Amino acid sequence: MEADFVIIGSGSAGSAMAYRLSENGRYSVIVIEYGVPDVGPLIQMPAALSFPMNMETYDWGFSSEPEPHIGGRSLVTPRGKVLGGSSSINGMVYVRGHACDFDHWSQSGARGWAYADVLPYFKRMENSQGGQEGWRGTNGPLYVQRGKRDNPLFHAFVEAGHQAGFEVTDDYNGEKQEGFGPMEQTIHNGRRWSAANAYLKPALKRPNVKLVKGFARKIVLEGKRAVGVEIEAGRTFSTIRARREVIIAASSINSPKLLMLSGIGPAAHLKEHGIDLVADRPGVGQNLQDHLEVYIQQECTQPITLYSELNLFSKARIGVEWLLFKTGDGATNHFESAAFVRSKAGVEYPDIQYHFLPVAIRYDGKAAAQSHGFQAHVGPMRSKSRGSVTLRSANPREKPVIKFNYMSHEDDWADFRHCVRLTREIFGQAAFDPYRGAEIQPGAHVQTDDEIDNFIREHVESAFHPCGTCKMGAVDDPMAVVDPECRVIGVEGLRVADSSIFPRITNGNLNGPSIMVGEKASDHILGRTPLARSNQEPWINPRWQVSDR
């Protein structure tokens, strides 16, 4: 079996590339996916978002090694093992990232990936329902909507931010990210709008696109040229050959693993596992980054939260309405208000993100408070901690060793203390007076730096945004894995295009920029002239040097 292009992974970037590479009908594309079909309400119902990430049917089941700086806790790292990849198990929050994120990419060696370069690709992929005119795309495959914000708590959160002196923004994906405002969702007609729904399924209707179910074991190389992929399907091993290129889009965990299994990575590490060296790229598996967050929870004195919907009868009613009409509480992820703010004067653009939720519960649906409540998920966006993904053995079936080194930099602790205290300030504003009860978590007794640090150590959680393990950069950067056209340095006919190529994590959730990578990489692969650069200038707070708000 062979095709012009062989893509490993049907996730956010892989699906976008399958769509774009096959669009003109000239080239054939094979997408290799080990995961299951994305069918059923557990995947497609937005409110069921906590289920698939806890199920081995849909998730690769990765976890970090015990993390020494958070008390030896091992944090789960869900990655989608399903059509659509992690876009089929994520929280459906859509964030492009801040313009300065991409300018930093370009300045660090990923030339051609500045905000002016990537903004046209965000517009090309979007079908925005209500975003800022002129800044948003309206004809792309990816539907993006705002929640209805029927619950008054969503408006209280935005008003509280305004009362605390922060900016308000109507579209954090438009000209102005900084501020409090509505959250955007990848939901369409009451269903999760994953990369599979947006890109892969339309692509599979074309005669030149084929989906192959199989476990990718390694890249097949002839000398220093990639010519195919060895896959395992059942008990059968076979090679799918690429006439033009192999493109890895297997996630920030599996992409570096696959490179190393194929002889591309740190020479000493590969030798340790008896793998023949093809290209010594010490950056493979390094530069691992993520977002961490804590949940600040408050009792609600009025019975208006989702706590009323957590009983079995209400869940059944919500499920039936969604199955019949795709409406009601099942048709939203319930993240409908958000904020991006700066932690202190001298910070040019937001470095703290908020997700607001009208219920007090863990992201994975566990440990719900036994009362009406609301919560903010809050965390710093630019941690200085860095981790790694390395091989456990040369066996492709073994999960890799994942070490995030969470909270290993002292600045992370100061940033999180500020996040906790800032959230208390926001919840203490007059807008919450009609609703505010006692603090559930951390609890009023947690006040000193040491007490807050203990709370963080015990309760900090991943936001599930791993990236950076196949860093994009200049060809003379020894830690770069791919060049600015996503080509693996030192190997021909092989590219990586997914969140693993991010030089630095972006300001927000990663599904949006991952799809953008797939869109832009497609033009590089096809040899097209990139879309014309934008001349639109993003809003930067004129007081950023003297004030945090």
UniProtKB/Swiss-Prot annotation:
GO biological process: glycine betaine biosynthetic process from choline
Keywords per UniProt: FAD, Flavoprotein, NAD, Oxidoreductase
Reactions mediated catalytically: choline + A = betaine aldehyde + AH2; betaine aldehyde + NAD(+) + H2O = glycine betaine + NADH + 2 H(+)
PROSITE patterns to which the protein is assigned, alphabetical: GMC_OXRED_1, GMC_OXRED_2
UniProt-listed Gene3D superfamilies: FAD/NAD(P)-binding domain (3.50.50.60), Glucose Oxidase, domain 3 (3.30.560.10)
Source taxon at top rank: Bacteria
Gene Ontology terms for molecular function: betaine-aldehyde dehydrogenase (NAD+) activity; choline dehydrogenase activity; flavin adenine dinucleotide binding
Active site: H465
InterPro entries linked: BetA, FAD/NAD-bd_sf, GMC_OxRdtase, GMC_OxRdtase_N, GMC_OxRtase_C
Positions of FAD binding: 4-33
Pathway given in the UniProt record: Amine and polyamine biosynthesis; betaine biosynthesis via choline pathway; betaine aldehyde from choline (cytochrome c reductase route): step 1/1
Pfam families (alphabetical): GMC_oxred_C (PF05199), GMC_oxred_N (PF00732)
EC number: 1.1.99.1, 1.2.1.8
Cofactor list: FAD
Known function: Involved in the biosynthesis of the osmoprotectant glycine betaine. Catalyzes the oxidation of choline to betaine aldehyde and betaine aldehyde to glycine betaine at the same rate.
Family: Belongs to the GMC oxidoreductase family.
Entries under NCBIfam families matching the protein: betA, PRK02106.1
HAMAP family per record: Choline_dehydrogen
Protein name per UniProt: Oxygen-dependent choline dehydrogenase
